[in-house]
């Protein structure tokens, strides 16, 4: 039987880490996604990563066709052409725009999102004077209709600023419908922003004063100076940097008239009144929202106090998580480096059915996502210097993971080293060396909290979730084995990772190893492994037994323990 040994040469500084338009009529195609191992010798880029990425200026170019002179033209749904056909069984995603209203806020995300969702975008023409109630009723009608058509699937509402308020209102009025809300910089904070004082100022200014261009420029992510700095940091040649900045300036100037048409004086006044009504309604009905919610807050939002608002909504909504982006501005989805698909995958917010299925709903990371996940741990890898040894079927010990079976189901069972640093190294090494997507079974506290407290936020575990970690349970082990996955199991759990003085290399496994029976049921290969080295370099100075002797620390430990779910 194949075995694997895992050595840490050194370990220093470790830490724990028409109002109803159908989508395009092309035949549906299935996106083939492996949940165990990739078939090729090299990790392939998905189709959507091979295409050139769209920029903010593509957004402006597309906006030209969405600005019409018609008086009070109706709001409507449209499906982006570049999304083509989603994979089989994909849920519906309704994008609800911000104050611009054109519905193109996800243009930089369309290609990747189109692989996972059936995307509809709401377009609110500049001349449209629908009230907030009208917009809520329109979205509500669509949600109810699609829920009747596909009752077993969730409906995603992705909204920014104004659209986030619409999404909250629809969720509050329809608690019986399975909705997933992804809200970027919600305008529920309008009452605490400087925007509320803008309407009286606009009313008293002369008609000849054109406010459109400076107002819209404040919404544009990454002005010329910021973009120039970004180009310099990336190490572009000076002449190329100058060319990029010149193109930015020329493009901005060319679209002045388009931006002005979007935010005429009367339109701006209407939008401000709309935001005021939206914030009042949404805030008054927050207690009715039961939908699963993800708040995306920009730390550099110059329009709304989004950071504080994200924290407030986290306390108000029962099923809410928050992700913060401290260096980004108001138009989050249009900024460089923001990938909504990666955010959804890392937060485990993607599902095709009424409940989260960590096997069928899981989509492995792309090569760029993998590099981003493990880039932050590269220094730790260098410091630890892990060495992997495995035994082939003929009993020969080889360096690397050559002895690990390629075909699943395979169950790797081993010991936790101090602070569970092994959970960082093992999945990455399997990808680098064998192109195998290892599925670790981890403590449920990495996915949920029973209450807020001293434990680190679940966002610190986004990397592990992106790489395929699954909350440990008998059901999940059964499903992973049936899917022929490569599974990583530490029977000793967190108790073994936080072992006490004198417990170096001591196994703390349960008396009944139920995983053996489960593996036998599916004919899985059990690969035992051991991790050694870390306990030879680190010593536990103060352990749990010492800490509980201090009354204050004892109470803190009890409080922390109560925050997370109990496994056994």
Question: Can you name each region flagged by the protein language model?
Answer:
Residues 42, 48, 54-129:
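Conserved HGGG/HGGXW glycine-rich cap/lid loop of the alpha/beta-hydrolase fold
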Residues 85-87, 262-315, 321-326:
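Conserved serine/cysteine hydrolase catalytic core
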